[in-house]
Amino acid sequence: MAAPSLLNWRRVSSFTGPVPRARHGHRAVAIRELMIIFGGGNEGIADELHVYNTVTNQWFLPAVRGDIPPGCAAHGFVCDGTRILVFGGMVEYGRYSNELYELQASRWLWKKVKPQPPPSGFPPCPRLGHSFSLYGNKCYLFGGLANESEDSNNNVPRYLNDFYELELQHGSGVVGWSIPATKGVVPSPRESHTAIIYCKKDSASPKMYVFGGMCGARLDDLWQLDLETMSWSKPETKGTVPLPRSLHTASVIGNKMYIFGGWVPHKGENPETSPHDCEWRCTSSFSYLNLDTAEWTTLVSDSQEDKKNSRPRPRAGHCAVAIGTRLYFWSGRDGYKKALNSQVCCKDLWYLDTEKPPAPSQVQLIKATTNSFHVKWDEVPTVEGYLLQLNTDLTYQATSSDSSAAPSVLGGRMDPHRQGSNSTLHNSVSDTVNSTKTEHTAVRGTSLRSKPDSRAVDSSAALHSPLAPNTSNNSSWVTDMLRKNEVDEICALPATKISRVEVHAAATPFSKETPSNPVAILKAEQWCDVGIFKNNTALVSQFYLLPKGKQSMSKVGNADVPDYSLLKKQDLVPGTVYKFRVAAINGCGIGPLSKVSEFKTCTPGFPGAPSTVRISKNVDGIHLSWEPPTSPSGNILEYSAYLAIRTAQMQDNPSQLVFMRIYCGLKTSCTVTAGQLANAHIDYTSRPAIVFRISAKNEKGYGPATQVRWLQDQEKDVGPWF
């Protein structure tokens, strides 16, 4: 986590769709990039289900059906895959619920479920303010507040510290409640506390952590329950413990539990005053507990002022949800302020990146021409942009002259026989791509819809432009992220070479020029920026030359973005090998760089890569078809199709694919038999895939190949071939 002074809060100020009313007592969960909110309220209890797409910055109201639950507040809300469970909560003043509902988010279908009661004892009583946590196939219910009175208008509160376990059925439905026999001292009764479950990487013993809450007075105690031994304990912690609080949020990212907001004691209270009599206020304090070392770290203190409104203002009863390494916060009540008979609630949506993004996958080639590359890389969740860099063996003049002048190429060489490395091809395509169709990438409609069996690849292309060169604050990327959709079951990526295929091409001669004035020469190991891109695709035809005396262009600090308008551009050269790497950027800065990929610009006269690859199953195996290159550069003499196969060599170097030719001829289709597929290599680096390559040959020889990753479902698709 970044140092407190480096926290880069982002307020989402631009969004579309029906924005939910501000509220408190609601709950939120995440399904991939979607934040799903239910319940809570202010002027009455809300019963709508609201969804926020964190990529498109769009709110929407799904058309739910089935046993739609009544609105509730301070309820339990957990997510298991695309299934959401709701338990308990307040349905109206003084009347609480102990009903359980299940939402299948893939169909937006509600169902009321009736778990079996415990073998001994009673099922949970109606309650609010309890914790409801999921781990594996079980939910864990602890504490809350019940109403002892049968008259909802005569509220007699009773704080609870009972503990239940709810076993779930796989996919849908539940088995029933049980009351585990626990050991050790049980935490005191409470409501509006938080509970999370964490399991260390080297441990098979998950633990539930309960923090804070309310029992007449706010609490600041931390409790731990070992879910294997069912033993309660009170771990000793280091660092400054957050103030006693309730109605706060606790979110786990990695090995850290982040605590934000809630009701806390007023800082001006008399220390001799009983906790029951002192005043309380909302806070915007922000801390985390390292769950491995049991050490608290304060990121924003309760006394820290925010005169610039650069972070969420104090609140309680809000919601927080973790998507990747990013935390989102929405709404909540603003202290004791009232408007008529209602609380004043916050309307704002904020997020905070808790760490730099991981390295993206290697850059992958979609299409190469004589003077450009269309490249992509796997998307990294919750990032604001990508820094793309390249390196070449060619040397260029490094000068600060007019960027429109084309610099001379020194000592230039073009080797038509040199090809890119196969290591750039083993990464799979990410599960989601932008809704703007990308060449050779199959796209389908709704992010939660079940997969169709159609396996066509759409070859229509739309390229994404880099950010403006003089961007000074990367917060502008937040509202520019485009909508994503799930990738279908086949994705095509052109390759840089076909194994065992020789490319016979004459090098295009070009002159060596000697500069009239002494200039610095870029060294081969220096990396130059191509630019900063909002999406995971880029059309590369130029790059920025390093200023004289600089070894690198981009800093790795917070929002350190170079002013590209001051730098000189260099065009790509035909028949030249370029190395690429990419890094993701978020509010914490620029993350680590990816592994290096190599691609070669086309030599004039050779055919382009085949396009619009389609795969369909038939009785003999599969049918593979494609369209001719859009730029054949003469007559196409033949096509070759190749299949990546299993070999002993691949066990030593899995990234080095070995290909077997399965077709050679003039037709733009072929049949791949089940016998050939039995020898196929399955690439498991991301999602299981069988890899094909297809290339075209004209009078000069073979051009670049199109690589096809046929994504496999391990049970459905891989099974018949093995």
From Swiss-Prot:
GO terms for cellular component: cytosol; MLL1 complex; plasma membrane; Set1C/COMPASS complex. One of its GO terms (biological process) is negative regulation of transcription by RNA polymerase II. Signal peptide: none annotated. GO terms for molecular function: transcription coregulator activity. This is Host cell factor 2. Expressed in the spermatogonia, spermatocytes and ovary. Residues 398-476 are annotated as: Disordered. Keywords: Cytoplasm, Kelch repeat, Nucleus, Repeat. It is found in: Cytoplasm; Nucleus. The gene is Hcfc2.
